[in-house]
Amino acid sequence: MAGGGGLKFVEMDVRNDDAYKLAKEWFDEVVFSVKFQDSIDKELLREAERNYGLVAILLVNPRLSIVKEAVQRFKQNYLIYVESSDLRTIRYSIERGVDAIISPWVGRKDPGIDHTLARMMAKKGVALGFSLRPLLEASPYDKANILKFMRKAWQLTNKYKVKRFITSSANEKWHIRWPRDLATLGIIIGMEVQQAKAALSTYPDIILKRLK
């Protein structure tokens, strides 16, 4: 699918093969995320790269040593994402210069970043990923809280000019949404229309240029 109007839409975080195949029909480029927690399997990464091309190492609630290893050994060839609600892990990951922190508000009672962390992200070039999937899986009460924290995180992102992207973070095919639907999520949390489009096109393209 072409973005239209010269835009190229990018899905930055897909975690399942069926979801990837559907996303490829709707987006111009798709990043396949390979999830690791305790150790990084090089052969699994190579296989993913052969199958999907653009690959991210997704570290979920990782030990700090795994974040360090990922950045030192693998950043040249892969994007590095961290998904964690632990502030120490988030801060360390930003300091190390991972490519993105994804949905740090999930599992917390706050946005997961503050003014200090947002400034650090801008300085280090670390993006913030706004993920749809937690909203799809949440109860109505939790959904309202997640949206509240996403709005606050967006305000900080906008204020400090942090890189950003909107993504499905799809674990299953049914999590995938059209670019227009993801842009609508951006508008709901306070983005202007052009900002939402940029979070699906301009900023992802900037992030991906590191690998090209």
Curated annotation (Swiss-Prot):
Subcellular localization: Cytoplasm
Cellular component terms (Gene Ontology): cytoplasm; ribonuclease P complex
GO molecular function, one term: ribonuclease P activity
Biological processes, Gene Ontology terms: tRNA 5'-leader removal
Protein EC: 3.1.26.5
Keywords: Cytoplasm, Endonuclease, Hydrolase, Nuclease, tRNA processing
Catalyzed reactions per annotation: Endonucleolytic cleavage of RNA, removing 5'-extranucleotides from tRNA precursor
Self-association and partners: Consists of a catalytic RNA component and at least 4-5 protein subunits.
Known function: Part of ribonuclease P, a protein complex that generates mature tRNA molecules by cleaving their 5'-ends.
NCBIfam families according to UniProt: PRK03892.1
Similarity comment text for this entry: Belongs to the eukaryotic/archaeal RNase P protein component 3 family.
Protein name: Ribonuclease P protein component 3
Origin species: Pyrococcus abyssi (strain GE5 / Orsay)
Gene responsible for this protein: rnp3
